[in-house]
Amino acid sequence: MTYFMFLLLMALVVGLVAVASNPTPYFAALGLVVAAGVGCGVLVGHGGSFLSLVLFLIYLGGMLVVFAYSAALAAEPYPEAWGSRSVLGYVLVYLLGVGLVAGFFWGGWYEGSWVVVDGLKEFSVLRGDVSGVAVMYSSGGGMLVICAWVLLLTLLVVLELTRGLSRGALRAV
């Protein structure tokens, strides 16, 4: 399990480097989806299955809006890929920076961070992430509905802004 978590964390770093180093929105959005998926996989590995599912759905909703906006405004006939020299230079600089920071903090930080949420499961009836679900839907239900409406409104505004003068599928908006 430790090796699997190490592999997920390395994939998270690679996904975030892919997002940070790419100037083209198509490939950066793909890196963002990979980074979000791997980050939620790390949460599942630590025992937060419901939290990771909710975060992944929120990430995908937000990334849909961002990707629609960036892809419509920055449509390039020949997008710059990860293999080009400038992007490869950024990738190497970011990986070197991550390696230097990891080398600076390497002394034992990983030993205490692998504790899962079920470490004290004999004292609890429910899992750690499930006990917060009732509070989220009872006390935070209104905020959840407001956030869903804001995401929908943002999607419609982005689609309206990127439509321009062409008469697309959203003629009534």
Curated annotation (Swiss-Prot):
It is found in: Mitochondrion membrane. The chain crosses the membrane at residues 1-21, 25-45, 53-73, 87-107, 141-161. Keywords: Electron transport, Membrane, Mitochondrion, NAD, Respiratory chain, Translocase, Transmembrane, Transmembrane helix, Transport, Ubiquinone. The keyword Disulfide bond does not apply. Its main location: mitochondrion. GO terms for cellular component: mitochondrial membrane. It catalyses: a ubiquinone + NADH + 5 H(+)(in) = a ubiquinol + NAD(+) + 4 H(+)(out). It comes from the Eukaryota. Its EC number is 7.1.1.2. InterPro entries: ComplexI_Subunit6 (IPR050269), NADH_UbQ/plastoQ_OxRdtase_su6 (IPR001457), Nuo/plastoQ_OxRdtase_6_NuoJ (IPR042106). Gene3D superfamilies: NADH-ubiquinone/plastoquinone oxidoreductase chain 6, subunit NuoJ. GO terms for molecular function: NADH dehydrogenase (ubiquinone) activity. It is a multi-pass membrane protein. Pfam families: Oxidored_q3. Belongs to the complex I subunit 6 family. Core subunit of the mitochondrial membrane respiratory chain NADH dehydrogenase (Complex I) that is believed to belong to the minimal assembly required for catalysis. Complex I functions in the transfer of electrons from NADH to the respiratory chain. The immediate electron acceptor for the enzyme is believed to be ubiquinone. This is NADH-ubiquinone oxidoreductase chain 6.
